[in-house]
Amino acid sequence: MIQLTDAHAHIKNEKQAMERITLGIPTMACAGTPGEMQELEKFGRLQGAEKILIPACGLHPWYSDKWEPEEMFSLMEKVPVIGEIGMDSVWCDVPLDRQRKALEKQLQFACEIKKPVVLHTKGQEKEIARIISHYPNTYLVHWFSGDTGLEDYLKLDCYFSIGPDVLWNPAVQKVAEQMPGNRILIETDGMEAVD
């Protein structure tokens, strides 16, 4: 039997956490704010969660105008993975300069504490590839769905997660075909993306 792992998800409530625990689906559960991390810590105390929920946290670019990255550092020290962090010029109104500063502070901290990073790159694929080239680490580019920057990330030995849209979106299928098989992971980003 094949064991599936969800490489990136946001778990919104106890019901979603219990579904994953009951089904035995290992999940990298990401928290993008201090409040989300509190919820994730609560879910981590559910019976069976320690073998299923893999916590990750970092200041998500959508919230980089509400918190400083340093407010997440003590939380980042508690988890095995940093993320999701990055930049977004498609779904986010936070000025890119502020997003960039938050990203660079978190990348520096991730390097200092030697933890891998999950990246959010929407609309900023080339810029983020340029930035991370200065912070050698292990990176997962989450829900990678475009060909912009693919070669840059491959040169940096990054991993990629692809979402459910690979099942019906020809553009995502084309990108997935260009990725090395040993660099592709699957993700839901949360059950809302699957429903």
What is the predicted role of each segment?
Residues M1-D195:
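Mid-domain alpha/beta scaffold segments of enzyme catalytic cores
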